[in-house]
Regions:
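Extracellular beta-rich repeat passengers
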Residues: 1-158
Length: 158
């Protein structure tokens, strides 16, 4: 796939259990804008996901959802999957048309108009991320992997 991230459950039986259910927060995913490998995050084959405080850019399709089982996991009736405070540079690509770009944009803090305006290739953060009360997470008030006030990548080169 050459994706920035691909999450699958079972390609032969998308309804198979146990269901793959990654939980990720404070993620920055940057593609190289190549014409090949156009997907950023690919959710498919029945996977569920919780993704919070993320930036996705540099791919023609920043976020693709595939298979009815995966797309239905975002429905208000089931809702085991959550996408909140996600900023990306393209609209969501829905293969089945069940979970649409309008549904994504209606989610808390989601946007499809993110523009990397920095010229040095560094993707900065966007303030106002979700506070996660689960002790598994370290609290952060920003989206992405790097705080503007504490750049742990300072000095890195591309």
């Amino acid at each position: 796939c050459d994706c920035l991230m691909e999450c699958d459950n079972n390609g032969n039986n998308a309804a198979a259990t146990p269901v793959a259910h990654p939980v990720l927060a404070n993620v920055t995913l940057v593609g190289n804008n190549s014409a090949a490998g156009t997907r950023g995050v690919r959710l498919r084959a029945g996977t569920e996901v919780e993704l919070y405080n993320a930036i996705i850019t540099g791919k023609a399709k920043c976020l693709t959802v595939e298979t009815a089982e995966t797309e239905n996991s975002f429905s208000k009736q089931q809702n085991p999957s959550v996408l909140e405070y996600i900023s990306m540079s393209t609209e969501l690509d829905s293969q089945e048309g069940i979970y649409t770009n309008a549904d994504f944009e209606a989610g808390a803090g989601n946007a499809t108009d993110y523009v990397n305006t920095l010229t040095d290739g560094y993707v900065g953060t966007i303030q106002g991320g979700k506070t996660l009360s689960d002790s598994f997470f370290t609290a952060a008030a920003y989206k992405g992997a790097v705080s503007a006030s504490d750049d742990w990548t300072a000095g890195w080169t591309l």
